[in-house]
A protein has these predicted regions:
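Sec-dependent signal peptide recognition
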Residues: 1-6
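Hydrophobic h-region of N-terminal signal peptides that target proteins for export
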Residues: 8-16
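N-terminal secretory signal peptides
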Residues: 16-62
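Intrinsically disordered, low-complexity boundary segments flanking structured domains
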Residues: 17-20, 47-48, 70-72, 100-103
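Active-site-proximal beta-strand/loop segments in catalytic clefts of secreted hydrolases
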Residues: 34-36, 64, 86, 118
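Short, intrinsically disordered low-complexity segments
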Residues: 57-82
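Helix-rich interaction surfaces within compact, conserved domain-sized segments
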Residues: 75-124
């Protein structure tokens, strides 16, 4: 029974957004970066070198705070940065987002960069 329910969920059509004109449907990706030891200057250099060339149409960068349960059960806490990027969903964009994540992990010695994807109705 569980297998049938899972199969039905996988084959069900995705719900389309009902965007009201002049809004149009766009994909949204949130990238969440640990910023514990990353200076403001290093962050801006990273944005200029790795992010802006891949997403020249624009993005939003936010400062935040994050916490999670680390190995051993302790709560780890650190400053965080969040990028919000609205874009067309395609393989080239996915590759660009993954390249940004990889570059950040390598440059700043991070274990991960969280990625959250969704859809929004967008108008300017």
């Amino acid at each position: 029974m569980r297998a049938i329910a899972a199969l039905l969920l996988l084959t069900a059509p995705a719900c389309a957004l009902d965007c009201k004109l002049p809004a149009k449907e766009m994909a949204r990706t949130e990238l969440l970066f640990g910023a514990g030891t990353v200076s403001e200057s290093a962050w801006h250099q990273f944005l200029s070198r790795e992010v802006t060339p891949r997403f020249p149409d624009g993005l939003t960068a936010l400062e935040g705070y994050g916490q999670w349960k680390a190995d051993g059960g302790t709560i780890a806490k650190e400053r965080a940065r969040v990028l919000l990027i609205w874009h067309s969903p395609d393989e080239k964009t996915d590759a660009a987002l993954d390249a940004i994540r990889g570059a950040y992990k390598k440059q700043f010695h991070q274990q991960s960069v969280m990625r959250v994807d969704g859809e929004d109705c967008v108008s300017f």
